[in-house]
């Protein structure tokens, strides 16, 4: 397999497998890969001692919060080869994992099981209605039931609810309230190599769901916030009369300054 796909630019890590054992055959597989490609690291969550980087599957949030501080002596860099199982209404706790992972430069992230629901069109024999068919819907026995329906996308690649949660958590810039009475927010540039100068930063204020201050430009962070840096900035609320009985939200948008 390595020979067949070695020139694919999208491949950055080789994996020795998923959910198998720690046998000596994996040591030999690692050696074989290195005779072909020494430019990419190799991971294998069942035996971190024989590969180039650390990994595991489905750790608790508490474990990740400890591991990023060096509590467990894990091998860096670290990549959680599976940490979320997108079945049903899942992946609602991603932000807790990522707040821990993004607190260090040594955790590379993790992989979600998986991208797309694996089903095909089937039809109700009575009504003729079309639906997504999977395990058992075609009279197949034995089958794995709905364990092929784990995606953040439907079989036709339309997004499920999980998709929007993942998109939000995986965004390259983070914004956090620090002191909203005084308009202070924190901007975190999650990128590893580029500052925020490619973006126009625009914020709007909403009162009880209605926009009361629109498209205000925040120019300072564009050049000031470098890769992996956090800085506080003040929104100019001097022209707004805040009502103690109202609910307020600030929407901050990062728009490309130039078309790309």
Model-derived features: where do they sit?
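Substrate-binding/catalytic cleft of secreted carbohydrate-active enzymes
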Residues: 1-150
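Carbohydrate-binding surfaces of carbohydrate-active enzymes
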Residues: 100-260
């Amino acid at each position: 397999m390595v020979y067949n796909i070695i020139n694919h630019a999208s491949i950055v890590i080789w994996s020795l497998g998923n959910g198998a054992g720690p046998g000596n055959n994996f040591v030999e597989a690692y050696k074989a890969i290195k005779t072909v490609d020494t430019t990419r690291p190799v991971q294998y969550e069942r035996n971190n001692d024989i590969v180039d980087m650390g990994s595991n599957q489905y750790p608790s949030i508490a474990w990740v919060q400890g591991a990023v501080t060096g509590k467990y002596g894990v091998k860096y860099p670290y990549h959680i080869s599976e940490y979320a199982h997108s079945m049903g209404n899942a992946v609602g706790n991603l932000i807790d994992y990522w707040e821990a992972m993004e607190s260090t430069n040594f955790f590379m992230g993790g992989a979600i099981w998986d991208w797309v629901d694996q089903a095909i069109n089937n039809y109700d024999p009575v009504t003729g209605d079309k639906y997504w068919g999977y395990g058992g819907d075609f009279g197949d026995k034995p089958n794995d039931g709905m364990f092929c329906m784990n995606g953040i996308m439907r079989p036709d690649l339309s997004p499920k609810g999980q998709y929007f949660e993942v998109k939000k958590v995986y965004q390259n810039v983070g914004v956090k309230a620090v002191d909203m009475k005084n308009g202070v927010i924190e901007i975190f540039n999650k990128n590893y190599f580029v500052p925020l100068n490619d973006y126009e930063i625009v914020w709007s204020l909403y009162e009880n769901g209605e926009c009361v201050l629109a498209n205000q430009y925040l120019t300072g962070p564009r050049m000031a916030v470098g890769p992996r840096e956090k800085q506080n900035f003040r929104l100019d609320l001097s022209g707004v009369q805040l009502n103690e009985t109202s609910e307020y939200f600030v929407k901050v948008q990062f728009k490309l300054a130039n078309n790309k």
